Amino acid sequence: MAKHLFTSESVSEGHPDKIADQISDAVLDAILEQDPKARVACETYVKTGMVMVGGEVTTSAWVDIEEITRKTVRDIGYTHSDMGFDADSCAILNVIGKQSPDINQGVDRADPKEQGAGDQGLMFGYANNETDVLMPAPITYSHKLVKRQSEVRKDKTLPWLRPDAKSQVTFAYNSDGSIAGIDAVVLSTQHSEDVTQADLIEGVMETIIKPVLPAKWLSKDTKYFINPTGRFVIGGPVGDCGLTGRKIIVDTYGGMARHGGGAFSGKDPSKVDRSAAYAARYVAKNIVAAGLADRCEIQVSYAIGVAEPTSISIETFGTAKVGEELLIDLVRRHFDLRPYGLTEMLNLARPIYQATAAYGHFGRNEFPWEATDKVDALRADAGL
């Protein structure tokens, strides 16, 4: 059978952009803990020796931005100046302002159910049945690799690891869409000066790659690229500046589904960039889990200040067991995609977001949008 290749990448919690995402979501969580109705748009910039936290916030809560930032950086593992970035000595600038009243009047309503969308925009949700979490395999295993890197760094199994790392996995697919195997694996990890390249390659292969990637997909032809430049001592915010919202493909489906362009981290649930993308994943996952399609991509769109979505469309890539018009009817009947409705449906007005800010927002069953609790209702209504 003819094969085609598809590649996705992930980055670790110590990557500069992910540091920024985690700080933004840590601030969001701290505010939501005190004020579930807060309006938050928190952006973070990190560079050598400095973190700047900005954005727009309307809330009755008071939170200690400096302490939240230092704790987040400390938990990631930047705790010594020889890494070029130290949680306890970096400068922290707070330039947060208030949300525009022009936006606020379009969002808030006397009847909460009529809450308008916080902005216009389009969002996509996706699911397929090639992994047990109904996510594409390339992004799923890219996340698993860098998550494993973090685990063996923090438990000192590989004490020379440092926080910054990237992974990339290329899968080969058969012409029928099934997985043929893994064609290539890339893992680059920051490390201390005192480890040899040979020890690093052996440690990464035996302790990170082999325990994570299923042997059934590996072969003598699988290619491995471990720290292919030969040296990765300078990393984190010294190597590159980091910004909130710059890893939107890592955060979602690894490029296998389309993306509306809006980032997630630092945004409260009134921002449909985030909440509607979560709801769209919830819809797509339940459609696939119900056996109504093997692959499902849903698009929703909104107008600022308007509650009802301006459009809903579904693409099943020829895998649907029922008509796509029926699927859209099922979505409208079983899922409330108005901003207030989806926030209530998924219980989003609570501090659950910092955990999403590294290793992907989807395919992790601890999050409410990963539930498959609509399966029976969808199957019954579809006549299956």
UniProtKB/Swiss-Prot annotation:
Cofactor: binding details: Binds 2 divalent ions per subunit. Binds 1 potassium ion per subunit.
Binding locations of ATP: 15, 164-166, 231-232, 240, 246-247, 263, 267
GO BP, sorted A to Z: one-carbon metabolic process; S-adenosylmethionine biosynthetic process
Reactions it catalyzes: L-methionine + ATP + H2O = S-adenosyl-L-methionine + phosphate + diphosphate
InterPro entries listed in its UniProt record: ADOMET_SYNTHASE_CS, S-AdoMet_synt_C, S-AdoMet_synt_central, S-AdoMet_synt_N, S-AdoMet_synthetase, S-AdoMet_synthetase_sfam
Keyword Magnesium: yes
Protein EC: 2.5.1.6
Keywords, alphabetical: ATP-binding, Cytoplasm, Magnesium, Metal-binding, Nucleotide-binding, One-carbon metabolism, Potassium, Transferase
Residues annotated to bind K(+): 43
Source organism, top-level taxon: Bacteria
Pfam families: S-AdoMet_synt_C, S-AdoMet_synt_M, S-AdoMet_synt_N
Pathway(s) served: Amino-acid biosynthesis; S-adenosyl-L-methionine biosynthesis; S-adenosyl-L-methionine from L-methionine: step 1/1
Residues reported to bind Mg(2+): 17
Binding site for L-methionine: 56, 99, 240, 271
Annotated stretches, region: Flexible loop: 99-109
One of the record's GO molecular function terms: methionine adenosyltransferase activity
Needed co-factor(s): Mg(2+); K(+)
Location relative to the cell: Cytoplasm
GO cellular-component term (any): cytoplasm
Similarity comment: family membership: Belongs to the AdoMet synthase family.
The protein's role, per its UniProt record: Catalyzes the formation of S-adenosylmethionine (AdoMet) from methionine and ATP. The overall synthetic reaction is composed of two sequential steps, AdoMet formation and the subsequent tripolyphosphate hydrolysis which occurs prior to release of AdoMet from the enzyme.
Quaternary structure (record): Homotetramer; dimer of dimers.
Name this polypeptide is given: S-adenosylmethionine synthase
Organism: Shewanella pealeana (strain ATCC 700345 / ANG-SQ1)
Biological classification of the source: Bacteria, Pseudomonadati, Pseudomonadota, Gammaproteobacteria, Alteromonadales
